């Protein structure tokens, strides 16, 4: 396995033979599924989850949530495995809690019914591309289906990992579906025109991407991916993570050839901020990525008369300003087309993921980190955690067996 596994969010545009027709408020069109009501088998161990999915996804939104992996609907070139029942339950309730319920809260009554994917297919294992050093986190197909991978690694105790693998992926792929319904402004495609590279983004560090005006390396692969990455990252990144991204984006970054031993000699104390950080790529190349500043003939930092680092911007590109410009376009697009305020969505996502004080401000632990709400006593029943309370949405259906 390679030393570093790049993350790939792959968007598959599947051409549907009958074409794609957007729905109007007056006519949502017929269901794409067999609409006959088949009674669920109460003798099955999975009856509670099957009932939950029927009541919360199929009936209100015409969404078929598939957790029993279907080979014919999977990547047949990969060795994939199904999601466990336990992880399927967790992902299902979190999908409702952190995705559907929030858009239901701030969208129009028909927003999800019109724009939701018709199929959500959950796979238990990772989808790896070893030859490319990439990993497929999710796939959106033809505006109808979203496939999510790696469900068996879902860990509600680790929100960063959970967002990266699942909820950023959900918002990313959902953004593609919305972009097919109301195309993004053509002006967006021009902001970073000439800077997209579909072949080299996998080796682009986060800081370099940010300095160029991209919220993630993958955003630098194509304008369409840039658009949905802005949406997904803004919604799922917490306030500390977003602030760190914007700080990195405020600088110009450069790539320097440097061995690990040379880097170790230089990266000490206050020099660390100007030396940057070391990284060894899949092909064995050793690189250092550092902020651009004035340097002397020996490549050491040249301080000004007051002893301060002289940060430089040789390209004239201000990554933080570019990211905010892109975000404003996404904000206006959601507001103009669906009357949805992305800041309301983001605020509610974070409120459901992290502990807050009575005044709505976030709570921090003694190390200055946000506190995971899912692992804390729930508001509804303090004797159990929020995650345990959400799981009861499913287990409560056992009473019907």
PLM-predicted stretches and their roles:
Residues 119-122, 145-149, 179, 226-234:
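Structural recognition of the beta-strand scaffold that forms the well-ordered cores
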Residues 63-83, 307-311:
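Acidic/histidine-rich, surface-exposed loop or edge segments in extracytoplasmic proteins
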Residues 160-185, 228:
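Active-site recognition of the HExxH zinc-binding catalytic motif
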Residues 28, 89-145:
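Auxiliary, metal-adjacent structural segments of Zn-dependent hydrolase domains
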Residues 196-340, 345, 352-401:
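Metalloprotease/metallohydrolase-associated module, dominated by Zn2+-dependent proteases
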Residues 1-5, 13-63, 387, 395, ...:
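Bacterial Sec-dependent N-terminal signal peptides
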Residues 77-85, 134, 153-161, 165, ...:
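Second-shell loop/turn segments in exported
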Residues 96, 100, 104, 175-183, ...:
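Sec-exported extracytoplasmic/periplasmic mature domains
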